[in-house]
């Protein structure tokens, strides 16, 4: 029989030395078989004593071997699943990019929404819309389509130039005004921002685009007069744009219509957006250049954003209508109805310019440069004595009339003097008339002009009485300062 110590020693040795050979295993079974038979009836009443340290080490060794094997199996399974998942993802992307290209609507290269990438889908929608249009609408649409093909959006240079920037610095928000298209001539602009539309479809753009320096820019349009049959469209467009169409109907344009719909590059189907606006309402348009977001307001209440990501375009405020109406636009020259825009000063530019305008006429007394030019301009001009008296056979200087100074240019009416009797050809008075003419010419040569006396000498450099102006500057005089230096000196004196 084996004692407990022999059993522990044998198990420890087998674990350390590894798995024994088949012959060794059979001998072990024979040795332990008798032990199990001998101890079998005794185990019914046996209570195990406290586990020793060596037994704990054996149990830990057995658990560690089992855990390492499980971890290895788990790692292998996860690796296989990960590789399979990556392969499935790659195959899905290849299938999606290769076999579904024609059925997708993709944003353009800058991620801007509303651009039609699927030409077939757009052509299908266009064909369905043209069937429901009348002949006039079809003609207008085809005309606009031809205009856009000949003048693609953003094909013109619309950045603010240096001269426009200086005009904004000088005039402030007053630099913005609406310029109607002369070829259309279906609207009239008064006082720069008051637009009156007539009986056909027409749009009008501002002369300058919305700047991009500040965080938000905002402007408002008040509906002063609007019949129920007229449709008004207020929004933003780029140049060139077909102004015989309303904003929002074609690419790179967006608008809020009086029917409560919005249009964003959509000539066919409008989208319901907000409440309708009628006479007396105020519609505002806001633009965030940093995020390219456009939003609208109605009577001071902000509506949801319409578009995002429109950063690269230069947008022009645009108002259009298809019937008689009157719209007044506020670019910031007055207070806004939208309180947030009023407080944060979201106008297109300051109300007053920061650059002083040119000085008015007659205010050059304090300018050294202009005063010097005035002095030089007072130099009298002299002519030769040969030109002081002229004679022409067609001028009758000896005839009667009021005596005037050569410098008198008054427009007072002259007294009526009966002219001498005309002497016609083939009359008996022809010879007498010739003699009278010779006598008059002789008298003219003997008499000097009235109130005229030639000066004793004609100075070469010009002289007026006792005053004499030297046109040659004195080398001892200080140099004439430049314009900038003169302006700076004048400001310091003030």
UniProtKB/Swiss-Prot annotation:
Annotated TM spans: 77-97
GO biological process: protein transport
Disulfide bonds: none
Organism, scientific name: Coccidioides immitis (strain RS)
Sites where a glycan is attached: 436
Keyword Transferase appears in the UniProt entry: no
GO cellular component: endosome membrane; vacuolar membrane
Lineage, uppermost ranks: Eukaryota, Fungi, Dikarya, Ascomycota, Pezizomycotina
Protein name: Protein SSH4
Highest taxon of source: Eukaryota
Family: Belongs to the SSH4 family.
Domain named B30.2/SPRY: residues: 140-336
Function: Components of the endosome-vacuole trafficking pathway that regulates nutrient transport. May be involved in processes which determine whether plasma membrane proteins are degraded or routed to the plasma membrane.
